[in-house]
Amino acid sequence: MPTVSETSAPSRTSASYYLKLLICILFMFFFSKIVPSWGGITETGIAAIGIFIGLVLMIVLDFGLIPATLMAIFAVVMTGFYDGSAIIAQTIGNSTVVQLIFIFTICNSLIQTGAGEFLAKWMLSRKSIQGRPMLFLFVLLFVGWICGPFMGTGGLVLLYTIMDYIIATLGYEPGSDFNMTARIGLQTACMLGTAFLPFKGITLAIYASISGALEAAGIQTNYAYYMIFSFLIGVLYCLGFMLLMRFVFRVDISRLKTLDVSKMEVMQNLRITPQQTISIIFTALAILYTLIQLIIPEGSFKSWYNSITLWLWAALMLAILSLLRWNGKPVVNPEQLMGRVMWGVTLAVAAFTVVGGMLSNNDLGVRTWLGSVLSPIFGGMSFPVFVLVIVIVATVITNFFSNLATGLIIGSAVAPFCIEYCSNLGINGTFICLALVSSCMFAYLTMAACGPAPILLSQEPFVKKPGYIWSHGVPPLILGIILIWAL
């Protein structure tokens, strides 16, 4: 419902809205007509800079991902760098964009069938972890990490429901250190978990901001290595936070000895359905395609296997999953699954891939100019220091600013240097992508950090103690920075 102030001055709101929109359009379509070339950048290169600035501004100013990206794609065609047919191949026809659609769809089957929720409940209700405070706490945090890539905000809601049961059963106050610190741990673990799948949602958009430039320079990245090390970061973070909670914050967890989560009403009669089993199997098969590539020996079979590509394999898994029936009913509804695709993020990946390709194109001069400008900052850095700077800057900024915009801006800015490090030192660019994505997803200190941040910060204990998130949220942030950089 609109407030009085919103309804009393519509002209002022409209004027502000259209003024901002006009500025974005000027950047996208007229920047190269107004601003003369500099630093050896061609007119098309100047236009690419304007499109990038206009696209980021439209996203930051909340004009929406879909209109912003469609306008940017049209602006690219207007530069003459691509024609209408070529832009289709570079955007919607790009394998990265297509795989995002199918991977996102098949992963959503875990939500549609309830398989993701079952797995979370199953792990937390194991008898082996009941009455063992440290072990239970680790599993709770790890389940939070798993919820990130496979359940999203729905997983956080489930975990906070379990936390409500724990504090009520054990007599902890809502404002107790145990309750508030554990919730920070769950939120941060979940956010780190969202970085696990590099071919899904916002993660892919940020990943592609660097990988797109690397691939344009002939440098390939590897999803399998990415996921393996992202998993290690997640496990080590859960262990590290557990130790922080116990030995640094000195939170009393002794009451967990008497806790039995399996007695919760939502944990009763916990049985997996055939539909959930099938969904888990096919989602795992889709993801394992990339990991299997690491163990197949070189030869004709590996060449054939690689020719299938991840997007086509995921599409096949989705097709088979959609055809399967149980008791006369489909296991999943493919139309509903496809309807849940985040088209805004998908188009953002497409648009930034194209614009990023223009910015990194040697013939347009932007990459050379950007290198000369930033070389005093990055030029003399060793590779470890370079990555550390990226991790610190991205992690700090993303906690005050949109994590998607942060990742896209930083990724585009450092991509030319990533190319140099990879080309000259033989560095695997996958790990630079992992560092940036993990840093940008580690957002939770302020409401503006990311979409799920208000789920934590709007809870009553954090509203009553606004400083708590800083005193107990910054140390985990430092822990995350160290782990992301070290791995």
Q: What does each model-identified segment do?
A:
Residues 60-67, 95-96, 107-117, 146-161, ...:
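Short helix-coil transition sites and intra-membrane helix breaks within transmembrane domains
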Residues 89-90, 118-128, 165-168, 336-339, ...:
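Short amphipathic alpha-helical coupling elements at transmembrane boundaries
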Residues 11-13, 165-258, 262-273, 428, ...:
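Membrane-core helix-loop-helix motifs of multi-pass transport proteins
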Residues 43-47, 93-97, 125-139, 172-183, ...:
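Membrane-interfacial loop-to-helix junctions in multi-pass transporters
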Residues 1-99, 225-372, 472-485:
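Hydrophobic transmembrane alpha-helices of multi-pass small-molecule transporters
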Residues 124-217, 403-439, 462:
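Hydrophobic transmembrane alpha-helices that form the pore/transport pathway of multi-pass ion
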Residues 25-28, 50-56, 139-145, 186-189, ...:
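Hydrophobic, membrane-inserted alpha-helices
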